[in-house]
């Protein structure tokens, strides 16, 4: 079997197309088999850079045997010069290709991808409702519902609980009391008491709404720094926080270590940390207790499994970061099924919407706060006809 061509798609969801533009590749072979993968640059800036980076990497794998996944991963890493110290665009493209290759491999052997990386440890995964500051509206909604007041935050948490979730994640600081996103400069250094008080009021209302047994994850998006993160985290310790996410930039292990040592809450980070080499120093100094590799930018299924094993050595648990199309969701579930140190699955509000789910051929939705592991060969997901017909598309052959 040989790789004959690669199709690259820039997806266009029915709603919010500028906010979430998923980048997906399909690797085709000289048989009936093909595989899908995703580059996790659908939000922020850089989605089309990821699109073209996949095209740049395509010649590395064209004409090769797609079942040689480890060898092809090393070729992309070693034979491209920039692969050995790439950033999000390079590693997102690499990840998309690796996921697609693993999808082909699973289909070739007639097994789900979890069988290729150790076998299944669980049939379903517990999920949390993610990013409630953006609302937790009905599946049919066409956009977000920004929370501002403490009552808003409590209401959105209650909406998630009604769907069966026993864990939620919210950024209590990014939205100011006027309903506008705070300027990043106001969230660094020693921050005003107003910001801490506003966040605590929202968190307290949320805790009262959900009760003592629901797990609350506090998100910071790395808008805070080592000073403001400690100031904020110490103020919220009393609310029983499950873990504290991206309190510091994912660039300096010393600041992350200081935050972890100073605060009595488990620390999580990783969606902007790529490959096992970048994770190693954070794990060596115990500055991250919950690693959050984004399967579609950390190096794909091949590398994500290695990151999870590395974390296991240091007693760190894993919550794979998921915020993209149904392709990366399916790939994440395959790894989460197989690893021993799984913590919880992220169900981002974007993935809840029907206008995201319809991009996949299989409708993958939470059931009472859990996700079932796909049992179809490969990753268990493909792009839908709607996604294929509406996407911008180029082919490399």
Per-region residue spans from a language model:
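Metal- or metallocofactor-binding catalytic centers and their adjacent structured scaffolds
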Residues: 28-109
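Structured beta-strand/loop patches that form or line metal/cofactor-binding pockets in enzymes
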Residues: 1-36, 40-42, 350-357
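Extended hydrophobic packing segments that form well-structured cores
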Residues: 378-397
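Ligand-binding pocket scaffold of soluble enzyme catalytic domains
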Residues: 29-31, 36, 68, 108, ...
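Shared catalytic-loop signature of beta/alpha-barrel
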Residues: 55-57, 234-243, 249-370, 374
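Proline-centered loop/turn at the N-terminus of a beta-strand
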Residues: 112, 126, 215, 266, ...
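Metal-dependent enolase-superfamily TIM-barrel catalytic cores that perform enediolate-based chemistry
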Residues: 124, 129-257
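Conserved, mostly hydrophobic/aromatic
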Residues: 3, 32, 57, 97, ...
